[in-house]
């Protein structure tokens, strides 16, 4: 279990706390949904969990031990909003192998099969994939790292409805083997596979209730 205890974050240039004593328990194979208005701190929370930025107060505990930002970067795989903007390889194959001295072809094949890309041409550029396929590729890149937690920031942003459903099906397909945290403005897409849903309001993380929609 990963546990966040009273996490507080305030940007150096701001005078308001983006996150104020946020606590959250994430159990193995759960899918956690986090919603909230734009600018409410959802992406910031993912970046703290994944070790990309450091919080000022509070603790993050993994298997009853405090974990620092460097350790969390190993624990977590994060797929940013519009991940296709960050592709660096000239081909899909090079994109998948980027950063590895060596990686088994069997592992790549297995991960591509999990995300529904088993039939793609690895010599093609990533730009030739559809929007939904590019999101699947971004997830595959993170799954190759075998992370304990997969963090998805607005995974359906900018996609048409059919591609949104493509991403929903992907999350559904990998949910049995992965612990996933999804930040989204479209919670209705993922509610059938969600374990818990939270909303960020004025820096506070609150377990979702029906009356919070008002």
Residue ranges with predicted function:
Residues 50:
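Helix-to-loop junction immediately C-terminal to a conserved catalytic motif
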Residues 178-184:
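Conserved H-loop
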Residues 58-74, 117:
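Conserved ABC transporter NBD signature motif
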Residues 150-154:
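Catalytic Walker B motif of ABC-type/P-loop ATPase nucleotide-binding domains
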Residues 160:
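ABC-family nucleotide-binding domains
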Residues 105-120:
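Conserved ABC ATPase "signature" region
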Residues 142-143:
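ABC ATPase C-loop
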Residues 125-129, 133:
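Conserved ABC ATPase signature
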């Amino acid at each position: 279990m990963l546990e966040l205890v009273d996490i507080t974050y305030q940007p150096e240039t701001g005078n308001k706390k983006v996150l104020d004593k946020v606590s959250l328990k994430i159990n193995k194979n759960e899918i956690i949904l986090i919603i909230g208005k734009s600018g409410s701190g959802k992406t910031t929370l993912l970046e703290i969990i994944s070790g990309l930025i450091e919080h000022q107060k509070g603790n993050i505990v993994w298997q009853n031990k405090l974990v620092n930002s460097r350790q969390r970067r190993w624990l977590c795989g994060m797929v940013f909003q519009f991940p296709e903007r960050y592709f660096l390889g000239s081909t899909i194959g090079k994109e998948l192998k980027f950063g590895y001295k060596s990686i088994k072809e069997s592992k790549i094949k297995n991960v591509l099969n999990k995300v529904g890309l088993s039939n793609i041409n690895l010599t093609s550029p990533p730009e030739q994939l559809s929007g939904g396929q590019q999101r699947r590729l971004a997830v595959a890149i993170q799954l190759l790292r075998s992370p304990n937690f997969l963090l998805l920031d607005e995974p359906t942003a900018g996609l048409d409805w059919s591609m949104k459903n493509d991403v929903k099906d992907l999350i559904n397909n990998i949910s049995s083997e992965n612990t996933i945290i999804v930040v989204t403005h479209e919670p209705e897409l993922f509610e059938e596979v969600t374990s818990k849903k939270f909303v960020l309001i004025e820096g506070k993380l609150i377990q979702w209730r029906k009356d919070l929609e008002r």
